[in-house]
Design a protein with these regions (language model features):
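Basic/polar, cationic surfaces and motifs that engage anionic cell-wall
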Residues: 1-21, 25-26, 52-165
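Short secondary-structure junction motifs
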Residues: 43-45, 118
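Aromatic-lined glycan-binding groove of carbohydrate-active enzymes
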Residues: 39
Length: 165
């Protein structure tokens, strides 16, 4: 089993009603096509994907390094939320995602940290000049939607959130 050192949150950058009515499995298959056919990767880049209704789907096997943040895939788990098209890194979670996704993401993080220990949880936007996942993960973890922290404050907030659960 590989050593897990962190969880990195992403978004698929799809419109809120993208493939509305399609199954989560069909959506995951489409993302896998984007990653394998269009980018030439060996598999889908994310380990987990969370649909708009809160359904959590498995992607790449967790035993294998992902393909979700250049230079930071080794030891990390990639989790992607469906949605986020047109988002900003300074948006609130609820600006782009559903309450069902919120609950599922919290639950998945709790389960992963129960298995792998209190590893840091960060957003793609902390490693690259991107909006993804469309909110500040540290602020979301620390106190939901009440403030928008940036940079170092996100890291401190994420660290402190480990002791609040």
């Amino acid at each position: 089993m590989r050593k897990i050192t962190g969880i990195i949150v992403h978004c698929t950058a799809t419109h809120q009603d993208w493939w509305n009515g399609k199954t989560t499995s069909a959506k995951v298959s489409e993302v896998k096509k984007w990653h394998t056919r269009d980018r030439g990767w060996s598999d889908i880049g994310y380990h987990f994907l969370i649909d708009r209704d809160g359904t959590v789907a498995k992607g790449r096997p967790i035993e294998r390094d992902g393909a979700h943040v250049s230079g930071h895939n080794k030891g990390t788990i990639g989790v992607s939320l469906f949605g986020g098209q047109g988002s900003s890194a300074d948006d609130n979670f609820s600006d782009n995602f559903t309450s069902a996704q919120d609950a599922s993401l919290h639950d998945l993080i709790d389960r992963l940290q129960s298995t792998y220990g209190p590893v840091p949880v960060t957003g793609h936007n902390e490693y690259a000049a991107k909006a993804c996942p469309g909110f500040r993960v540290g602020a979301w973890l620390a106190d939901g939607e009440s403030e928008k922290a940036t940079g170092f404050a996100d890291i401190i907030a994420a660290f402190l959130s480990l002791f609040r659960r």
